[in-house]
């Protein structure tokens, strides 16, 4: 910080590694900590630069923001400060630190320039901000910004009075909250012996108030359970069987009417109709099978005659009694059949 930077007071535009652009006036550069401090800073956001997390611009103007040099992607000097004359009419010269001149008569009430006045546009070496910047050390990882870009910045009024105080309604991070509740104060230690004596007195008083009488309760005779098993009767006498049901008039045939009423109450009228339909269809199927079996029997009976058409048509249709090919069993009686 001994050497003054020639761009102090210039308007700077820098872009961080998150592609966020900031504009402000260069206040100081710390080469030891590799930090740059800007005053009157405004954030313009990412400005349509390709980034994973776009950030919108903000209209807020922050008094001071300190940036870490390693996290700055680009830096541009927009405007340099104008050369101002130093006291006494001397031109601006970085080699001049202070100027002393003769005191002029204070006709208009303005104070005269005192000896040792600092150069215009350059901060004092012992300014509070310079001391704060020199004492800053980079933190572990991340973006160490002591004056972060949010609304919780100090209201700068003529200096850094109060450090990080006077924030706009935000709590100081890292500062524990003060509990304003009043703590109980005890004049002396708690006496356990006195407390036990009071407890014993209260317990004795409560016991004296109780009326305890020894009353013997009458003994209640236990009722004996009746025998649940009679050896005289057999275990199998009450089991249902066909002989008992016949003796009582019960038959082994199911009562389809009662069963239908029970099914209708349980499953509904449509379910009972579907059950009847399935039962009837099965009966017709069985009848058809029997008919098909009869056809097979007839067909087999027809083919028992190896002779030809005579026996087959005579058995089924009742026609063609004459003519045709005679069976093999009747070859000896062919002439007799022709005579008839």
UniProtKB/Swiss-Prot annotation:
Gene disruption phenotype: RNAi-mediated knockdown significantly reduces protein levels of ATP-dependent chaperones cdc-48.1 and cdc-48.2 in embryos.
Protein name per its UniProtKB record: Protein LSM14 homolog car-1
Keyword set includes Nucleus: yes
Native species: Caenorhabditis elegans
Cell compartments where the protein resides: Nucleus
Record PROSITE patterns: DFDF, FFD, SM, TFG
Region of interest (Disordered), ranges: 101-148, 277-340
Example of a GO cellular component annotation carried by this entry: ribonucleoprotein complex
Chain positions of motif FFD box: 227-243
Keyword field: mRNA processing, mRNA splicing, Nucleus, RNA-binding, Spliceosome, Transcription, Transcription regulation
A Gene Ontology molecular function term of the record: RNA polymerase II core promoter sequence-specific DNA binding
UniProt short sequence motif TFG box, positions renumbered to this chain: 251-271
Any one biological process term the GO annotation gives: P-body assembly
Domain Sm stretches: 1-81
